[in-house]
């Protein structure tokens, strides 16, 4: 019984530590990955209907279940 309790506490402690160690900076937590709008390279955002503000995006195209947003001069 105490082994189960110990493992449970270990898992809970690990989850708390992982959530506290997560970066708070928006630029650090950017969720985009590379994508292409024709020949223009952009950043893919899942489940978005418009490009997030504050990143300098000037255009976008529809991409699989989200958007591919690209900045000026791309």
UniProtKB/Swiss-Prot annotation:
Entries under InterPro entries matching the protein:
BDS_K_chnl_tox, Myo_ane_neurotoxin_sf
Entry's Gene Ontology cellular component terms: extracellular region; nematocyst
What disulfide bonds does the UniProt entry report for this chain? Answer: 35-68, 37-61, 51-69
Which terms does the record give in the GO molecular function aspect?
ion channel inhibitor activity; potassium channel regulator activity; toxin activity
Further facts = Negative results: does not show effect on crabs.
Subcellular localization: Secreted; Nematocyst
Positions of the propeptide removed during maturation: 22-29
Task: Please provide the record's keywords in A-Z order.
Answer: Cleavage on pair of basic residues, Disulfide bond, Ion channel impairing toxin, Nematocyst, Neurotoxin, Potassium channel impairing toxin, Secreted, Signal, Toxin, Voltage-gated potassium channel impairing toxin
Designated name of the protein: U-actitoxin-Bgr3c
Entry function? Potently and selectively inhibits voltage-gated potassium channels Kv11/KCNH/ERG. Acts as a gating-modifier toxin that shifts the voltage-dependence of ERG activation in the positive direction and suppresses its current amplitudes elicited by strong depolarizing pulses that maximally activate the channels.
What top-level branch of life does the organism fall under? Eukaryota
According to its UniProt record, which protein family does this protein belong to? Answer: Belongs to the sea anemone type 3 (BDS) potassium channel toxin family.
Source organism of this protein record: Bunodosoma granuliferum (Red warty sea anemone)
Q: Give the classification, highest ranks.
A: Eukaryota, Metazoa, Cnidaria, Anthozoa, Hexacorallia
Specify the signal sequence span.
1-21
């Amino acid at each position: 019984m105490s082994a189960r309790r110990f493992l449970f506490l270990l898992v809970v402690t690990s989850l708390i530590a992982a959530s506290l160690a997560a970066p708070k900076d928006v630029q650090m937590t950017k969720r985009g990955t590379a994508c292409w709008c024709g020949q223009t390279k952009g950043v893919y955002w899942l489940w978005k209907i418009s490009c997030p503000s504050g990143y300098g995006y000037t255009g976008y195209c529809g991409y699989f279940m989200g958007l591919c947003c690209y900045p000026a001069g791309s």
